[in-house]
A protein has these predicted regions:
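ABC ATPase nucleotide-binding domains
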Residues: 246-267
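Helix-to-loop junction immediately C-terminal to a conserved catalytic motif
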Residues: 56
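ABC ATPase NBD Q-loop/coupling interface
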Residues: 65-85
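Conserved ABC ATPase signature
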Residues: 147-151
Length: 267
């Protein structure tokens, strides 16, 4: 059963520049549920990455609260947690390419276990079992002993997702996890993330430009335009929010089938 895990209260996000403060979105009141795959949609530059970085505590909110609710534990605002505590609660996969050399895929995935190791970072047999399970889940067993710097962009993305799985956090945030994958791999990745949300009751929230794929696999959508639209794919289709986002001359959206149609004669 889905329960509220991340709760946003009057949240305003943005960043400071030498010319002042740039507000990206403000007054957000919403919740991200456990046991659900939530996809964040929106045009480039609308603030998706800023929202993800704020939710991940990589940058501070301009105002408002981000509350983490955990079963049997008092709810706390995200700023009340230490970095060590957050590393056991939230796993993050960003689009930045890690500059890593002289490390194998298995060694990189093993870094996901660092929140659970002692001062010396020693991994025990149980930790390595978790690492190998994460590698198998993402279907990169053949890459296990490859050096990270020899990987393609798509292979590297899968490795970083395996690292997040090895971290065993109840919450995982991902910034465009399917960006460098071919279409079959995109589908497999989204299905994997959906399965993890369902079977392990994880809270999985990701940004994506794979519009039609998101409509097919997401439990909930967050659509960032001039305002934030939240609902199931069918709810946002019926409200007209999805059509308003994607339609333009030569492009129409079918709210019944959740598909985009292209009229080449009108392009």
């Amino acid at each position: 059963m889905a329960t509220e895990t991340i709760i946003l209260k009057e949240l305003s996000i943005g960043y400071h520049t030498k010319n002042g403060t740039r507000v990206v979105a403000e007054g957000i009141n919403a919740a991200i549920q456990s046991g659900e795959l939530t996809c964040l949609l929106g045009a480039n530059g609308v603030g998706k990455s800023t929202l993800l970085r704020t939710l991940s505590a990589f940058q501070p909110a301009l105002s408002g609260e981000i509350v983490i609710r955990r079963e049997g534990v008092r709810s706390q605002e995200i700023s009340a947690y230490t970095d060590k505590e957050l590393s056991r609660l939230i796993g993050v996969v960003l689009t930045e390419k890690p500059d890593i050399r002289n490390m194998t895929v298995r060694e990189l995935v093993a870094l996901g276990r660092s929140p659970y190791t002692g001062f010396w970072g020693t991994l025990h047999e149980a930790d390595w079992q978790v690492v190998d399970e994460a590698i198998n889940a993402v279907r990169i067993s053949k890459l296990r002993e490859r050096m990270v710097h020899t990987l393609s962009d798509g292979e590297r993305q899968k490795v970083m997702i395996a690292k997040a799985l090895a971290q065993q956090t109840p919450v995982i945030f991902l910034d465009e996890p399917t960006a460098f994958l071919d279409f079959p791999s995109k589908v497999e990745m989204m299905q994997l993330l959906r399965r993890l949300a369902k079977e392990e009751q994880k809270t999985i929230f990701l940004s994506t430009h794979d519009f039609e794929l998101a409509l097919q696999v997401a439990d909930k959508l967050w659509l960032m335009t001039d305002e934030l639209h939240i609902g199931t794919p069918h709810e946002l289709a019926q409200s007209g929010a999805l059509a308003g986002y994607v339609e333009r001359p030569g492009i129409t959206f079918d709210a019944q089938t959740l598909t985009v149609r292209v009229n080449n004669d009108k392009l």
